[in-house]
């Protein structure tokens, strides 16, 4: 378990651009940059120790759409840990991304539909697999958040506790992109019950959220932030220094 969470900037890719959605709605997007590689460079310059990439088109279409952009970012920052989700539905895609230089691959919808696939991926790519759990009111959502299932997020997390998953990215859909604050209770509860390190996502707005999450460094490995750093309500460098205790 990680004692000091890292701030992880999100770079969400849609139609070749860096965007942010509200509550996962593809039609409700804000374009922040036409150059995702330049945006990645900005966050690295500001002190990012890890990047979170999402192929939004891939998540909805079920196949990778932004391979070239992802490869370009990985090539530009070969020593930086990079995690990616969206459109990962088979072993070939995982292999291609890891070969391209990505550190972690996030399996979301496929993890719900075929848990055995996660176990197989962990065997083939040990230490590189993250499960992405997106939830609304504690219930798992799939296919780019289009479908809400009857599976509890905590129950899904427990399924992967012993198969070699590196961590879980937990996103509270209701708060994602809404700047309403992170759901600390559900995030910590998932980590405690699931038995895996969790990367918090959805709702991070300002330093107050970072302060609320810091005490749970024993189970929260990272904090993904998107709109807050893009709109300036959270300073990436300041937040990381605070978590570092400096």
UniProtKB/Swiss-Prot annotation:
InterPro entries tied to this protein: Aldolase_TIM, His_biosynth, HisA_bact_arch, Isoase_HisA-like, Isoase_HisA-like_bact, RibuloseP-bd_barrel
Annotated GO CC locations: cytoplasm
SUPFAM superfamilies on file: Ribulose-phoshate binding barrel
Chemical reaction(s) catalysed: 1-(5-phospho-beta-D-ribosyl)-5-[(5-phospho-beta-D-ribosylamino)methylideneamino]imidazole-4-carboxamide = 5-[(5-phospho-1-deoxy-D-ribulos-1-ylimino)methylamino]-1-(5-phospho-beta-D-ribosyl)imidazole-4-carboxamide
Catalytic residue positions: 12 (proton acceptor), 134 (proton donor)
Pathway membership, UniProt: Amino-acid biosynthesis; L-histidine biosynthesis; L-histidine from 5-phospho-alpha-D-ribose 1-diphosphate: step 4/9
Family of the protein in this entry: Belongs to the HisA/HisF family.
Protein name per Swiss-Prot or TrEMBL: 1-(5-phosphoribosyl)-5-[(5-phosphoribosylamino)methylideneamino] imidazole-4-carboxamide isomerase
